[in-house]
């Protein structure tokens, strides 16, 4: 028993062929246990200044997406379309044309990492163009920290209850 229901393996910082090999290795292992694998093509940065993240940004190449999915056997694909991990220092500008082109090439669910701070209208548009899963880890951490700070003088279980409530509200 692997105590998990899915795996996300991000090898996107590696050169393309190494990314393919690493994801294929993970898929071969985890599929033996019926565990789906999410991969990333293109590289979603992690910078505190959005413009700096974009300077070395690697958008998902739609022409490689189909081959990548076929060669690796991944079950879902995280795309790099102008999104970054962490807190945005300015308004993110998503490349919806890239998303639309990738969606036409692959038959697996698409994932948007670094969605914390992306506006509701852009999220809705991304969903309409094929995004099936959205990661908002930074927003959830912020909600948890706000709840902890607001209830720091209360007993632990009361704080935990407020954190769960705040995270759930933020996620919805």
PLM region spans:
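Extended, intrinsically disordered, low-complexity segments
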Residues: 149-172
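Glycine-rich beta-to-alpha transition loops that act as phosphate-gripper elements at the mouths
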Residues: 109-120
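Alpha/beta enzyme core
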Residues: 1-106, 120, 124-136, 142-149
């Amino acid at each position: 028993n692997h105590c998990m229901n899915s795996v996300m393996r991000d090898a996107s910082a590696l050169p393309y062929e190494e990314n393919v090999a690493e994801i294929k290795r993970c898929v071969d292992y985890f599929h033996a246990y019926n565990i789906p694998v999410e991969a990333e093509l293109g590289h979603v940065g992690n910078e505190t200044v959005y413009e700096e993240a974009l300077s070395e940004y690697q958008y998902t190449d739609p022409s490689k997406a189909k081959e990548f999915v076929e060669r690796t056997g991944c079950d879902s694909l995280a795309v790099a379309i102008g999104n970054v991990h962490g807190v945005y220092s300015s308004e993110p500008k998503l490349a919806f044309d890239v998303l639309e082109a990738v969606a036409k090439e692959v038959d697996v669910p698409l994932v948007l990492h670094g969605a914390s701070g992306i506006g509701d209208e852009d999220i809705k548009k991304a969903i309409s163009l094929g995004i099936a899963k959205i990661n908002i880890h930074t927003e959830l951490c912020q909600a948890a920290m706000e709840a902890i700070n607001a209830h720091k003088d209360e007993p632990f279980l009361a704080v935990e209850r407020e954190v769960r409530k705040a995270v759930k509200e933020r996620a919805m």
